[in-house]
Design a protein with these regions (language model features):
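Low-complexity, glycine/proline/serine-rich flexible segments
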Residues: 1-42, 79-83, 88-93, 154-159, ...
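Extracellular glycan-interaction surfaces
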Residues: 3-25, 47-56, 73-147, 341-344, ...
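Extracellular/lumenal carbohydrate-interaction signature centered on repeated Trp-anchored short motifs
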Residues: 34-46, 99-109, 151-154, 165-172, ...
């Protein structure tokens, strides 16, 4: 069983979502659309599924920005709370800020917001639903006056992934749905699975979207802003490419690196591209920093890749997720009860002991890692060529993919590919279930680390 398993973890969802769109603040990614005419600014709904990556900074999910005194946004604030504010004529006209924080980077949240300023009950004029349940606990709860227009559905530019020219978002969005003129309920966009109780999406294509409504499913890699509602309310794509189309979705959740899984004293690496880009600059001896996967396993056969982005010292492999012995910097992959790794100088590190193993590797090399927890061995591949099997002698524990720099006054950087690559793949290979997009062939019987495979083989 996986150690860390997100809320979207059932094998048979009934309705499958094919794609999400990965936003990265470092690339200034966003979508934009300016409605040609204003419609229902007092009644509308917005639903989407979102998986966060970077935390602790203000990130706008949507923004409608006319000027500094007239704007509207839904965002995660710098305390990771959900924040929805309508600001007009230099005054707050409506605001909800949750007490709850949203720090789970391993799963998708479904967020539904409903604006209905004509509602006779003031507390029902701005409503939030999280995974099918209405949010009722707020640090700030300011109700709009009756009939107060919002900025949404105005002729001001609507952006997804930023507001104005700042506060860019980091994470994945799927099933982005806007309905003009209707107050949706959670059951219009999702349902609780009868066996697991997990909130899951349903087919929304039959909704009445209204004039300015839209449905972005992100399935067309050549037109990522394509509206499939039938309204042709397409969004313009900015700094997003086909590489940012991901199969990491609310019905098949893939592993990423986990910025929360870090002991020690703040010696954190940098994370980008949906927590698939590892970057760490060592500023002295021992200034190394390990990053771990959101998913750990103790049975089955699993495969992932990394792409080296420089020639500096780095190691990759699997680490004890249950009770590792951390050094003063919070690293454990190279400790006696840690795990097994492949060093880019060609050595292997097996439970803290380094010895000769295979070929060295450098910039742009692809390292494949095949984890066999049924037969207790791990095999590393360099550009598709096996470097030999290594025995896993510490059994009965959970292992997690891990990566760590190992240099002195240098920067080590790599892309992780758990089947949802943040870089261009030239060949394209999936596992036996058809999941994942890998540069080299997946060994027979091995699978990508995602929740559908985990439900079947984990």
């Amino acid at each position: 069983m996986p150690l860390i398993l997100g809320t979207n973890s059932i094998k048979d969802t009934g309705y499958d979502v094919a794609n999400s769109l990965r936003f990265n603040s470092g690339s200034s990614d966003y979508l934009t659309r300016t409605p040609s005419s204003a419609t229902n600014q007092d009644l509308w709904s917005l639903s989407f599924w979102i998986k966060r990556s970077n935390l602790g900074s203000y990130q706008s999910i949507y923004g409608v920005y006319a000027n500094s005194t007239n704007q509207e946004t839904l965002a995660f604030d710098d305390s990771d709370r959900l924040y929805w504010q309508l600001y007009q004529s230099s005054a707050v006209k409506g605001q909800l800020t949750t007490n709850r924080v949203f720090r789970d980077v391993s799963a998708f949240y479904n967020i539904l917001i409903v604006y209905d300023s004509a509602n006779g009950t003031a507390g029902n004029r701005m409503r939030m639903y999280i995974n099918g349940v209405e949010e009722t606990s707020f640090a700030t709860d300011t109700n709009p006056s009756s009939g107060q227009d919002s900025q949404w559905n105005s002729t001001t530019a609507h952006t997804i992934g930023r507001i104005n020219t700042a506060n860019y978002m980091n994470g994945y969005i799927s099933e982005l749905v806007a309905v003009d003129g209707t107050a949706l309920s959670p059951t219009d966009v999702g349902e609780f699975d009868e066996d697991s109780g997990i909130w899951k999406p349903i087919d929304v294509s039959g909704l009445t979207f209204g004039t300015n409504g839209f449905y972005l499913d992100f399935e067309d890699s050549s037109a990522l802003g394509n509206d499939v509602s039938g309204n042709n309310n397409d969004f313009t794509v900015n700094n997003l490419t086909a590489i940012d189309q991901s199969t990491d979705t609310c019905t098949n959740n893939f592993a990423t690196l986990n910025p929360l899984d870090k002991p020690g004293t703040g010696n954190l690496p940098g994370f980008a591209e949906g927590n698939l880009h590892y970057n760490k600059t060592a500023t002295g001896s021992g200034n190394n920093s390990q990053a771990n996967s959101t998913i750990a396993v103790n049975t089955g056969k699993w495969f992932f890749e990394i792409k080296a982005l420089d020639s500096n010292a780095i190691i990759v492999g699997i680490d004890n997720a249950d009770n590792p012995t951390y050094d003063s910097h919070g690293n454990s992959i190279n400790s006696s009860d840690g795990g097994i790794a492949y060093y880019n100088n060609g050595q292997k590190i097996v439970y803290g002991t380094a010895s000769s193993y295979g070929a060295s590797w450098t910039t742009n090399d692809i390292i494949g890692i095949a984890i066999n927890l049924d037969d207790n061995e791990i095999t590393f591949y360099k550009n598709g060529s096996s470097q030999g099997a290594i025995s896993i002698t510490t059994t009965g524990i959970n292992y997690r993919p891990a990566i760590m720099n190992n240099g002195y006054n240098s920067t080590s950087s790599a892309y992780m590919n758990f089947g949802n690559p943040p870089f261009s793949i030239s060949s394209g290979n999936s596992d036996g279930n058809g999941y994942g997009n890998f540069e080299y062939s997946v060994p027979s019987g091995y699978y990508a680390l995602n929740t559908k495979n985990l439900a079947e083989y984990g």
